Amino acid sequence: MSALETQNLGMVPVVIEQSGRGERAYDIYSRLLRERVIFLVGPVNDQTANLVVAQLLFLESENPDKDISLYINSPGGSVSAGLSIFDTMQFIKPDVSTLCMGIAASMGAFLLAAGAKGKRFALPNSRVMIHQPSGGAQGQATDIEIQAREILKLRESLNGILAERTGQPLEKIRADSERDYFMSAEEATGYGLIDKVIAQRA
């Protein structure tokens, strides 16, 4: 959900800061962005991807040597939108630390695993789920065949990246993602999707 959508629902708290020059009001997400924290909440789509990518690029321009934190609570969504976030995470200079709070499913789990090695975390009661990409092919038989070939290529690409990010054999990733494969935070650690379960700040 974008900040604009949550504002329309009247759900975004405002933080008032005092300074020598008076008061300044921030919505909570803008205030946390100043602390280099980005939220990916809700479905992964073109709109949320554009917001996350813009924030990643902005924070890199602010300080290319300081880590960025990406907090994830997402059921997944569009593969192309998720890959735009993934590619930007790898492209920028700062390490991106990921943290699952709630659920990281499908593309959410993929982005959780995309964080910098050693800096991928989950809160204790988080859930993580991987599966193969789904498609809604329509049209003439030839169109459906083209779309089917594309989704199979995407599946192999995603499986290869997950195998590299987790250290699991490609065949295991293929088998496990054939259907919805749910994991607890501890199981996701053992699987290599994250590096550590954290219950409290250090």
From Swiss-Prot:
Swiss-Prot/TrEMBL keywords: Cytoplasm, Hydrolase, Protease, Serine protease
Any single GO CC term annotated in Swiss-Prot or TrEMBL for this entry: endopeptidase Clp complex
Enzyme class: hydrolase
GO terms classed as biological process: protein quality control for misfolded or incompletely synthesized proteins
Keyword Ribonucleoprotein part of the UniProt annotation: no
Subcellular location: Cytoplasm
Main location: cytoplasm
Active site: S106 (nucleophile), H131
Catalysis performed (reactions): Hydrolysis of proteins to small peptides in the presence of ATP and magnesium. alpha-casein is the usual test substrate. In the absence of ATP, only oligopeptides shorter than five residues are hydrolyzed (such as succinyl-Leu-Tyr-|-NHMec, and Leu-Tyr-Leu-|-Tyr-Trp, in which cleavage of the -Tyr-|-Leu- and -Tyr-|-Trp bonds also occurs)
InterPro entries, per database record: ClpP (IPR001907), ClpP/crotonase-like_dom_sf (IPR029045), ClpP/TepA (IPR023562), ClpP_His_AS (IPR033135), ClpP_Ser_AS (IPR018215)
Top-rank lineage group of the source organism: Bacteria
EC numbers, comma separated: 3.4.21.92
Assembly: Fourteen ClpP subunits assemble into 2 heptameric rings which stack back to back to give a disk-like structure with a central cavity, resembling the structure of eukaryotic proteasomes.
Role description: Cleaves peptides in various proteins in a process that requires ATP hydrolysis. Has a chymotrypsin-like activity. Plays a major role in the degradation of misfolded proteins.
HAMAP family: ClpP
Protein name, as recorded: ATP-dependent Clp protease proteolytic subunit
Organism: Methylibium petroleiphilum (strain ATCC BAA-1232 / LMG 22953 / PM1)
